[in-house]
UniProtKB/Swiss-Prot annotation:
Gene: dtpT
Protein name (record): Di-/tripeptide transporter
This protein's record includes keyword Transport: yes
One annotated GO molecular function: peptide transmembrane transporter activity
Family label: Belongs to the major facilitator superfamily. Proton-dependent oligopeptide transporter (POT/PTR) (TC 2.A.17) family.
Bilayer topology: Multi-pass membrane protein
Database matches in SUPFAM superfamilies: MFS general substrate transporter
Organism of this sequence: Lactobacillus helveticus (Lactobacillus suntoryeus)
InterPro entries, sorted: Dipep/tripep_permease, DUF4931_C, MFS_dom, MFS_trans_sf, MFS_Transporters, POT_fam, PTR2_symporter_CS
Function of the protein: Proton-dependent uptake of di- or tri-peptides.
GO terms classed as biological process: oligopeptide transport; protein transport
UniProt entry tagged with the keyword Protein transport: yes
Compartments in which it is found: Cell membrane
Lineage of origin: Bacteria, Bacillati, Bacillota, Bacilli, Lactobacillales
Record's keyword terms, sorted: Cell membrane, Membrane, Peptide transport, Protein transport, Transmembrane, Transmembrane helix, Transport
A GO CC term assigned to this protein in UniProt: plasma membrane
Amino acid sequence: MRAILLFYMYYAVTKGGLGMSQTTAASIMSIYGSLVYLSTLVGGWLSDRVWGSRKTVFYGGVLIMLGHIVLALPAGVTVLYRSIALIVVGTGLLKPNVSDMVGGLYSVEDPRRDAGFSIFVFGINLGSIIAPWLVPWAAQGFGVHIFGSQLNFHAGFSLAAVGMFFGLVQYVLGGKKYLSTESLTPNDPIDKGDLLNVIKWVVIIIIAIVAILAAMAGVGQLSVDNVITLLTILAIALPIYYFVMMFRSSKVTKIELGIHLLPVSLKNRLFFKKGYKRLKQIIQLELAIKRQSFIILIALIIMASILIPNKVIIAKHLLKLVLLVFYWIGLNLIPFSTFVLSFLFLDYIKHMFKKEGEQAKKTKEKSRIHHGIEIPLFLRQLIINIFTLIILEGETLFDENGVEVNIAEHPVQGYTELNINLLNKDSIDLWADWIQSVAKYLLNIMYTADVIVIIIFYLVKMAALWWAWSYIPLSTVFVGYKYSGKDESLQAALEVL
């Protein structure tokens, strides 16, 4: 929906769009994306204090459906902002609470709990694969071009409304059978007096915002850029207020404070300049399809590993099959950087399937801290290698066995043996002496910086471990170690490249 909404805003009117400039359309999308994540704070509070997660998710789904119905109406800019407002509020109600509904299907000890979340993620990404095909098909006239040469974006928006309608029907019918009655009530119901006080402050804030917007309009400063600035201030102030309330509340336990840093990730979502760059990724639907395909493969393998008896043996065989498929995708379709980073994630998933105690035997206590810096050091090495490969592309060198190798045709040696000493080999004929000097200088700087980087990561890791053992449940620390373990097959993966 976000991709087609962007096109809808800046396509010419003659092509079925609104005729906005690309800058304005991108700015509106940034506002939309930021408000979605800000609204989740409100949705979580309403679920915990007023309605309960089950009702909150339902209300959110209804508002999202209504927002897409409004978008499906060919009323131009008049209804655009109203529909976005409905979708923002609806997403804020649904997004933070729907995962809670999935978790409520099973007890904490039930081994099917993780598989349930994998099915949930599988369904989301399955929809992400279907949508880039189905929406253009509808916009172009359902395969028979009933709209002529124009794109009918409203037909695409209507599909989202129809999908949400059937989702709500299934949610209501299935909820009566599978969802617990506890989800119908809030976890920490608010007193009537406190609720009235909250409503009073909400009304005051809304009036203040309207007054600010009216004042900006009065002096001719009501523009998209200025609205973004206003929202940026709000995006900074609201999380700070949220943290203050969390730390001051007597209802928040020490363990719950252990995950208080999670909302900090909001800053990456709410930084508008980064948000503008993210829009370019939205437009690249083909790459999005590949990414969602990869996530579905991951979800399937995790579900299989949990639900199938003797999961270690079966999961390893299934994972090998997934790796073979992913190798083919990576070598033929996906850009190099995307493949390497995605494979790194997949390889860490592999640690979930190791026999109990296998990793512990190979990991010494004193080296655990070092494992946490595997990813940043690997990425740094990757940058060095790519930089060196660019310099040496097409040139000849000899591998460790004395066999002549062309870097462009056989990059394996470039990734397994490249280091600063490689540039000193007589067999390398660089394009010019000054390139060699610059390369040596830059690479020496990066290698010298390793000492500082390692010291910093050791300190950060030790601080993080102390904090984790003090505040985070043991299971969370364990999972963290699972994903920060030494990557033994990374070398093999790079050889495949």
